[in-house]
A protein has these predicted regions:
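Short beta->alpha connector loops at strand-helix junctions that form conserved
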Residues: 55, 74-80
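Phosphate-binding glycine-rich loop
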Residues: 7-50
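A short helix-loop-beta submotif of the ANL/AMP-binding
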Residues: 67-73
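Active-site phosphate-binding strand-loop segment of PLP-dependent enzymes
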Residues: 78-137
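A structural motif shared across PLP-dependent enzymes of the aminotransferase-like
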Residues: 1-12, 106
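Structural signature of beta-strand start/N-cap positions in the alpha/beta core
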Residues: 49-50, 71, 99-100
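Conserved PLP-anchoring active-site segment centered on the Schiff-base-forming lysine
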Residues: 43-65
Length: 137
């Protein structure tokens, strides 16, 4: 386990795996995944916006969205295709008020790993958040 006394050392460490340099402003430490979800959802929740969540998926996203009056819309994952995103269900629920889409890769609870090609089909722009073990979340 690595212990950083300041965010500049953490930014330097994480930058070694990235094609760009992180600054201390890019880092927000939380006390685990639940708090991280709370922080992100609270920032995204604006009046009239919605968030797209996978079905099945981790229930904490919906619980946090509800606390902030953020409308939840669900898109399906297709078990017969390795739990890929159902592009048709996604297109039918996304609109100009969609503020975010949750993608968990590798997926929990299904265990699937989306390919770059599948994500490109979905027309997704992904921002990768790196946790303490450098896994993509």
């Amino acid at each position: 386990m690595l212990l950083y006394l300041n965010n500049s050392a953490l930014a330097e460490h994480l930058s070694s795996d990235l094609p760009y340099k992180l600054s201390t402003d890019d880092i927000f430490l939380t006390a685990g995944g639940t708090q991280a979800i709370e922080v992100v959802v609270s920032v995204l929740a604006q009046p009239g916006t919605n968030i797209l969540l996978p079905r099945p998926g981790y229930p904490n996203y919906e619980a946090r969205a509800g606390l902030h009056n953020l409308e939840v819309r669900r898109f399906d994952l297709i078990p017969e295709r390795g739990w890929e995103i159902d592009i048709d269900s996604l297109e039918s629920i996304a609109d100009n008020n969609t503020t975010a889409m949750v993608i968990i890769n590798p997926n929990n609870p299904c265990g699937s790993v989306y390919t770059h090609e599948h994500l490109a089909k979905a027309g997704l722009l992904l921002i990768y958040f790196t946790d303490h073990s450098n896994e993509i979340a």
